[in-house]
Amino acid sequence: MVDVQGTVADGFEPVRDAFAANFARHGERGAAVVLYREGEKVVDLWGGTKTPDGGQDPDGGEDSGDRKGPTGRADSDDRKASTDRADSEDSDGHEGSDGGPEPWTQDTAQVVRSVTKGVAAAVPLLLHQRGQLDLDGRVSTYWPEFKAAGKERVLVRHLLAHRTGVPVLDTPLTPAEAVDGISGPRAVAAQQPVWEPGTAHGYHAQTYSWLLGELVRRVTGRTIGRWIAEEIARPLGLDLWLGLPEEQRGRVGRIATVEALSAPAAHGPRLRPKRSVAEAYRDPESLTRRAFAAITPLPDENDPAYLAAELPASGGVATAEALARFYAALIGPLPSARTARSGGRLFAPATLTMARTEESAGPDQVLVVGTRFGLGYMLHGPACPLLGPGSFGHPGRGGSLAFADPEARIGFAYVTNGMRRGVTADPRAQALVRAVRTSLAAREA
């Protein structure tokens, strides 16, 4: 029996029950779930193991000591000690006192794969909100080299809605090239679109990193990871990084597979395309296979070099607390936020509307199921079931999920190191979302 730790506010007990059940029913390894409602934290749960295989943390070295966050402080003011670290870890911080796997604690962070896209998407929307970026402008206005190979008419909004026609690379990058900051932008700038930009959509699984990252660098003069740190993470007090500092490596949970990850899958009985995403992935010529294989071989996500890279498609590292707080801040003020901007609220009403107004819908040329995107965010639907019609956010391949629902006034995040085969509706995340829905309905009855 896994010892689930943390707190839930009255009425949210179903979330705790669902979280505990995930370990028994779905083979959960280590995970956390956090829910904010009306700017206040009402669920904060964690359990399982940080190093499921009993191995070392991603850095293979010593623990990170005082574990300071992006603000330079050791921990969030509202955090309560989850366990006595001296009892649960040995001197190098890798294993429990009994020599077994290290337990997941309240400050454990995790690589969240494509959940990163939802954090990264806030950057161009905030730049637009501040008058620095025209969403209806051409990408080549800011990045002249990008107009090559028939891409001169690609708009910024096409990029955010997965409509550029560049979800693949004719010549995949090596893991080293993917993180060098030069090869990726150069490759997508030279790539010929596989459909007429703006006429269709398909999930830019890997190329989103270099498309969005380079656009932000051209507009701001800063890397996207630095922009997120300076404009979002520090003001809001988030333990969230795109480009993990070396001193934070000891906090990161080690990824372990719950089931084979040989091919992506879209979970759920409602997803019945003529050709499944798993079948498409097995075809080496399919857009599905080529999109996910834009980096070949796939990088080791436990590798320190990967953790340190700024890959806005997949490389973010965060706690569940940080992601839930981030989404809560997109839609409403946070009383404890350390920023004067709108009491901690990030999106103005008009920006929030743009984030969740449908830009792309229907058959996805990569995922081969029907998907819905706003500007940078997946929207509620069969491929990405969230809380309700107004929800927006992003799942990550393998299970993690984070989103906001303005009508319910919530920010939700679930992170896991037990990677299941899947791109969209992971059964563990969906069990938690259903429990949130049940809890909210009971409170309003």
Task: Spell out what each predicted region is.
Residues A21-V34, D53-G60, E95-L159, E196-Q206, ...:
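Short active-site loop at a secondary-structure junction
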Residues E102, Q106, V111-V115, V119, ...:
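Active-site helix/loop module of the DD-peptidase/beta-lactamase fold
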Residues T171, H204-E214:
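Internal, well-ordered domain-core segments that constitute the primary functional module
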